[in-house]
Amino acid sequence: MSSNLFSLKGKTILISGSAGGIGNATAHLCVNLGARVILTDIRQEALKDTFNSLPDFQEREPLYFAADLTNSDELAALVDFCPQIDGLVCNAGVMKLTLTQFIKEEELIRIQKINLNAPILLTKSLLKKKKINKGGSIVYTASAAGVFRVSIGNGIYASTKCGIDAFMRTIALELGSKGIRCNSVNPGMVETALIGSFTEEEKANEIKNYPLGRFAKPEDIAYGIAYLLSEAAAFVTGTALKIDGGMTLS
């Protein structure tokens, strides 16, 4: 173990949704903290760009594997490709604002598959194949939405993020005896493509809810993820870590 408890030196970490946003920032931070990373995302070219942008440390060469985690065959192929890991970051997610009366079943199913089913099934498959080392750490990107705050039209997204937090707490109980910790980060609004559909007026109105006067940068969330992956969080499990700039205070 490093004398710096926040170091990730010697750890191998699988990061889903790593082609952009929070996943990209997490990949860069983990490498800079000494980890070897395995990147996965459905967007092959963007994933390759992330891979190529990482620092070149030959002794801990990163790996990448493009996969649609809602496809059982591709998920299985990723798990087979993956070496033994010390950390898992489930970060892939999508969002669509829709009033309840206008929800389309196909959209409901699509968002549930990506935000809820995929991280659960990836976790299950890695555990079944005994790919997560004792003393490992699992971190899910959940949300303040639904868990700590609700908003009109956000029922589908919020319900999936509530679901992933409930799953996180359940497996924290299940895996504690194996020394595997399970936590989540719960951001508010983050400056990523996920909020690209918001108008400037909508963003200006929303930012009034943030005491710190801005939305999060992807790096702000990555810092929390890296903490939960590190030995500094060795006694932290079953925790939903709010990183929301004080948004849920109001």
Regions found by a protein language model. Give the residues of each.
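Active-site loop-to-helix junction immediately N-terminal to the catalytic Tyr of the SDR YXXXK motif
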Residues: 103, 149-158, 170, 198
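Short, small/polar-rich loop/turn modules that mediate ligand/substrate recognition or access, typified
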Residues: 176, 181, 236-238
